[in-house]
């Protein structure tokens, strides 16, 4: 049905060949260009990506009467949202008294005071509405004995602004919450007139005078180029975990959205903040949900000690993810790891009733058996901190509008362009995301994009014309890759990049190692000129698509490591051995009376603004202030910074 919808639409649009000047592509012959058939489309809104954020945005747009296209490089229910396990946060108060303001406080604290408090206010206030909406769509939440939505404990979450003990705030569907959410949203979207372009790869944004007027994409099935002109474009492409060697991300998580903006001359933000999930299966990287610790599991070292009691005496194994990952790494570095090489940690669940494991954690029980050969009712799971989430991305405001920042003009909205989900930086996660806030981010900001677009767009009105020769650079790049006579395979260069990022920008970072990593990544970026795409065809050319994804990954990787090398402090997921302290505008570990507030240039409680020269790979940096004001002071006031402990 979905394929027929796009094919039916294709019959109504114009097709032509693209002509390029010789200067726009490498040594490709002019006759080669005629191979590229170009198809044009016109929509009120185009969504790139069909995970949770993309589907929620598309549903809202189509429900509001806008002609909406969804471009996705894989079938919607294979999007990486499907892999989220633990749950979605909302202060429903089903297990204990709760308040969205407590959720707001925990999220600000979890961000290590790098989160924008207006966006955090919006997300946490709207969380209950979002979960009830999902329930009304048919999402089969786990239930309590009295029929309410079951809520489990998750890391970094408290009652009464940190004074009331552990909160139970995470709504879940056993340990398959993302799977359920994705299928629920996709099923619900089919009742609206969304036009799906499945297995289409987004190549570039179409920009004219600073305005986004559409997207260029390639149909994987036959290699045709499609130009989507639209008044509104929503990026919902996920993260770039595959820039690292060990990660929980699917092979499709290649930072396509952040690369699209970088190529369009739009800045990204806070790319140095990469979350390492404490419990990826050792040797495999597969995720073991934080919900396993929320259900009563705990971490032990080689002495059988519950070591988190030393690092986080109150929260213990449910401290925030950055704290737990660093604590595990310290245990390993100091010789208290487990296994023959003492290079990992055990997650113990076998003290829990088998019935509880079967009911609440069936997915990870199966995963542990398949990937670690472990029966969780009898043995501990070998785990190690693993790259899991990117806090940085395309900067937006709480409405989802993409922002371009300059020191002279401050934040300026990029007309026609929105971002939601992991590819966006709203910034609700700041320097560290709380577990189960990611699924919330998806539905809250996917919906926010749709709301703002509907306020400013009437169906069929104002769809822009395409700039002359739109898409020439995209076709030139493809043609160059197909005909390049290099001697480096895509897989070889990708693996070198992944290992370099793992070695130079891991849980603990140091200036000299980061500096070396910057040099290595700079060389790897230039090595793209020597890539060899073995498959020269256009039909289902996976070699070509993986090379395009590698181009995207290298943009993300270089931005990440340069921003990390430049940030000389430790905050959230960014931990520097040589700069172990957080450097704020005031020293919040001491009485504030008598202190002088530092200027923005003299402290690090600020967002990094990152731009790339796509030709050379050179990265430039600016910084903008964190937003400390809430949307409405009468609803909740801001949370002032303080020393962060659990």
From Swiss-Prot:
It is an enzyme of class 1 (oxidoreductase). Substrate binds at residues 277, 289, 388, 433. Residues 1-31 form a transit peptide. FAD binds at residues 49-54, 72-87, 256, 422, 438-439. GO terms for molecular function: electron transfer activity; flavin adenine dinucleotide binding; succinate dehydrogenase (quinone) activity; succinate dehydrogenase activity. Pathway: Carbohydrate metabolism; tricarboxylic acid cycle; fumarate from succinate (eukaryal route): step 1/1. The active site is at 321 (proton acceptor). GO terms for biological process: mitochondrial electron transport, succinate to ubiquinone; tricarboxylic acid cycle. The modification Tele-8alpha-FAD histidine is found at residue 80. Its cofactor is FAD. Its EC number is 1.3.5.1. Keywords: Electron transport, FAD, Flavoprotein, Membrane, Mitochondrion, Mitochondrion inner membrane, Oxidoreductase, Transit peptide, Transport, Tricarboxylic acid cycle. It is a peripheral membrane protein. It comes from the Eukaryota. Component of complex II composed of four subunits: a flavoprotein (FP), an iron-sulfur protein (IP), and a cytochrome b composed of a large and a small subunit. Belongs to the FAD-dependent oxidoreductase 2 family. FRD/SDH subfamily. This is Succinate dehydrogenase [ubiquinone] flavoprotein subunit, mitochondrial. It comes from Caenorhabditis elegans. The lineage of its organism: Eukaryota, Metazoa, Ecdysozoa, Nematoda, Chromadorea.
